[in-house]
Amino acid sequence: MIGEATREEKQSPEDTTQPGNLESLGFRLSHVGVAVPKLAPAAETLRKLFGYQTISGPFDDPIQRVTVSFLKQAGDDAAEIELIAPLTDDAPIKAMLAKDIGAYHFCFETDDLDAALVHVKQQGCVVVSGPSPAVAFSGRRIAWIYAPTRQLFELVETGQAVQQPA
């Protein structure tokens, strides 16, 4: 039946790039992810330079092998900055740091992660990982996608967190 699913995936019943269809996915910029060697010095730099304050974290995420904190400017509706540091020696984020890449992903919230993944696949994106629950988002599901233009995006589902087993 694998062939059946493949044929269904290739069929696109509607063009998801039409404005009304995109609106139904509820895409909103959530944050910009920045790879850093250590959280504290980076957070302090953003505080001194631009007035950013830590609003959540740090969180250790054993699945992604990183530790993260979210920062925001007081009274500002702008997107947050997520600082991401390696938690282990084999953390994938270390590859970004080795290449001197800091800001490396934009994260968009979506009301329907499953429908959003169908949409991005139709646009030629590859799902790198997920959907899976994320510690930094109280168990809400995330997915990572790689665009044909060589950009990495994170999608995070809005709404209720996934209940973790006790």
Model-flagged regions — what are they?
Residues 23-29, 34-78, 116-118, 122-126, ...:
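Core segments of cupin and vicinal oxygen chelate
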Residues 29, 103, 152:
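Extracellular structured ligand-interaction cores
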Residues 88-89, 113, 134:
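Short Gly/Pro-enriched loop/turn and capping motifs at secondary-structure junctions
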Residues 36, 85, 110:
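Short beta-strand/turn micro-motifs composed of small residues
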Residues 31, 105, 142:
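Broad gene-expression machinery/nucleic-acid interaction feature
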Residues 9, 53-97, 138-160:
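Conserved short beta-strand elements that form part of the metal-binding/catalytic scaffold
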Residues 2-25, 69-72, 108, 117-166:
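Vicinal oxygen chelate
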Residues 95-123:
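Mid-chain, well-packed structural core segment of small domains
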